[in-house]
């Protein structure tokens, strides 16, 4: 059942965070739509020892506390990523902290890693551990942590065996000083400690910011390849505001997501594919709201893609539209499989 067309007019009048809470509640009650047909074979891809039926996933931030991953998978997502989760519960920044920019099909948030902590998420994931589907856990650090890297190590230890993969989130603009962990020396230490915290081989991906210069991107690519990260997620929200018209909410502080992020995040994706020589799987995220957007990310180097903000404007039907359109674009360009199109627009 898809109630979004009926609920959208009312929800658009609500505070965005309140509306999102109602969305999660509806999904918990089983009121979300379910996929009715299998995905086209051309959309399947194997990465990290995992088989993805399609490359479209829900980005972290939608389901911070792991309340509805199975509802998102049932909706037709190829994978679901929960979090960001920190060791201890924290309330995040004061409300209001999420702002719509409808004229730009964008959102600004300064949530600040609000979440219920490791224990609450672990309890939920233990309860669903035998269910099928690829589930990533996005781990972060508490705002007041004395040793933030230790918080990431704790995330690995807490969810190994429950997560299909990990995302190390060091690129949120809403936790003061967090992005400094992207600096080369800090990053080398972080990656070494996080990878050493694993007992097994659960894939570890790093989520990076779009607001990085060429030297910083080069350093991240070098560290990722040399130290054996399994992949990168490109990218988080941006602190830039170029192209936004002045108006309601345009000057709010926080991370900007949605359509205005697409050009910047795709450019960084393309650069990272080139810098890594196509040897490191990349997940493209930032401003995807159509099959054309998803296909552009793939041709720029993404093996998987994620969306979130566009769902707040277009609702669950967007998932099927993107998958159907993506399969059609692959066929039109002569690609039998998704993997054949990855990086097609990048000269290595």
UniProtKB/Swiss-Prot annotation:
Spell out the InterPro entries in the cross-references: Aldolase_TIM, DHO_dehydrogenase, Dihydroorotate_DH_1_2, Dihydroorotate_DH_2, Dihydroorotate_DH_cat, Dihydroorotate_DH_CS
Q: What is its main location?
A: membrane
| Class of this enzyme | oxidoreductase
State where the protein is found.
Answer: Cell membrane
Keyword Repeat set for record: no
> Is Cytoplasm one of the keywords?
no
- The record places the active site at 172 (nucleophile)
Its catalytic activity?
Answer: (S)-dihydroorotate + a quinone = orotate + a quinol
Q: What is its EC number?
A: 1.3.5.2
- Which CDD domains does the annotation name? DHOD_2_like
| Subunit architecture | Monomer.
Protein task = Catalyzes the conversion of dihydroorotate to orotate with quinone as electron acceptor.
**What is the protein name for this chain?**
Dihydroorotate dehydrogenase (quinone)
């Amino acid at each position: 059942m898809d109630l979004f067309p009926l609920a959208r007019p009312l929800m658009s009048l609500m505070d965005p965070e309140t509306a999102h809470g109602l969305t999660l509640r509806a999904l918990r009650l089983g009121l979300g739509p379910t996929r009715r047909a299998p995905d086209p074979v051309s959309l399947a891809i194997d990465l990290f020892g995992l088989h993805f039926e399609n490359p479209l996933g829900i980005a972290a931030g939608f389901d911070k506390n792991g309340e509805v991953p199975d509802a998102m998978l049932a909706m037709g997502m190829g994978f679901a990523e929960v979090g960001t989760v920190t060791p201890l519960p924290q309330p995040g920044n004061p409300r209001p902290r999420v702002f719509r920019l409808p004229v730009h099909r964008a959102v600004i948030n300064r949530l600040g890693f609000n979440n219920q902590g490791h224990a609450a998420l672990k309890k939920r994931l233990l309860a669903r551990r035998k269910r099928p589907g690829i589930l990533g856990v996005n781990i972060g650090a508490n705002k007041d942590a004395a040793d933030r890297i230790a918080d990431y190590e704790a995330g690995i230890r807490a969810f190994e065996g429950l997560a299909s993969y990990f995302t190390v989130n060091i690129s949120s603009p809403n936790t003061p000083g967090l992005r400094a962990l992207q600096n080369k020396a800090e990053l080398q230490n972080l990656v070494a400690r996080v990878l050493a915290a694993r007992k097994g081989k659960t894939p570890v991906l790093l989520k990076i910011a779009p607001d990085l210069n060429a030297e910083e991107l080069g350093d991240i690519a070098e560290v990722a390849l040399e130290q054996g990260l399994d992949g990168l997620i490109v990218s988080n929200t941006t602190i830039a505001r170029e192209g936004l018209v002045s108006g309601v909410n345009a000057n709010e502080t926080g991370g900007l997501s949605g359509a205005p992020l697409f050009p910047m995040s795709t450019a960084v994706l393309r650069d990272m594919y080139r810098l890594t020589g196509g040897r490191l799987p990349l997940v493209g995220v930032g401003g995807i709201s159509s099959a054309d957007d998803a296909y552009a990310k793939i041709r720029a180097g993404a093996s998987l893609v994620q969306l979130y903000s566009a769902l707040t404007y277009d609702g669950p039907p967007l998932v099927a539209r993107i998958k159907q359109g993506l399969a059609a674009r692959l066929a039109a360009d002569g690609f039998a499989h998704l993997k054949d199109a990855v990086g097609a627009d990048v000269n290595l």
